[in-house]
């Protein structure tokens, strides 16, 4: 009888501990997902406002920007430096660059996140192109930063 009671207590304790851990992980995961989304939203807000100061805060120091271009000979990948990207944004007037995204899949690990965002891009109010953005973010001491961004572009 004592063994049965001890066994039941162990089962209840294990179940309760597991449920508490799962709840804690869900809250942490939801919080991290919200933080990751905020970095991406800040990036697009900075682009829309041509705000290079805010824009720079969204990226790691060694961020990689790439675009997949569809050529008759096949896909090619173009790479741009962070400074070139930020300078190109800074040359625009506010509201000239309007990239409208939807959050697709979001995967968050304690130190890394992957986000897929379909988008439609408007330049000075006119449709320009659409495609998919794929973000890789890293959680540094100061918070989430975009480490890698690659996109596709279609008319």
PLM feature spans:
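Short, solvent-exposed secondary-structure junction/capping segments
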Residues: 41-45, 59-72
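A mature extracytoplasmic/lumenal domain signature
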Residues: 59-61, 69, 117-121, 150
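Bacterial Sec-dependent N-terminal signal peptides
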Residues: 1-27
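Short, low-complexity N-terminal intrinsically disordered segments enriched in polar/charged residues
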Residues: 20-53, 57
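Short beta-strand edge/turn micro-motifs at domain boundaries
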Residues: 130-155
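Hydrophobic pocket/interface hotspot
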Residues: 43, 55, 63, 115, ...
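Surface-exposed, charged secondary-structure patches
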Residues: 79-124
């Amino acid at each position: 009888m004592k063994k049965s009671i001890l066994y039941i207590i162990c089962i209840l304790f294990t179940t309760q501990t597991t449920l508490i851990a799962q709840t804690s992980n869900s809250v942490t995961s939801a919080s991290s997902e919200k933080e990751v989304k905020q970095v991406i939203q800040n990036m697009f807000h900075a682009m829309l406002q041509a705000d290079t100061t805010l824009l720079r805060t969204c990226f790691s120091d060694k961020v990689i920007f790439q675009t997949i271009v569809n050529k008759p000979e096949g896909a090619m990948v173009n790479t741009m430096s962070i400074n070139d990207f930020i300078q190109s944004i800074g040359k625009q007037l506010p509201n000239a660059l309007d990239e409208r995204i939807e959050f697709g899949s979001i995967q968050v690990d304690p130190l890394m996140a992957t986000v897929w965002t379909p988008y439609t891009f408007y330049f000075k109010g006119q449709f320009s192109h659409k495609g998919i953005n794929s973000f890789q973010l890293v959680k540094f001491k100061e918070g989430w930063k975009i480490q890698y961004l690659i996109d596709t572009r279609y008319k």
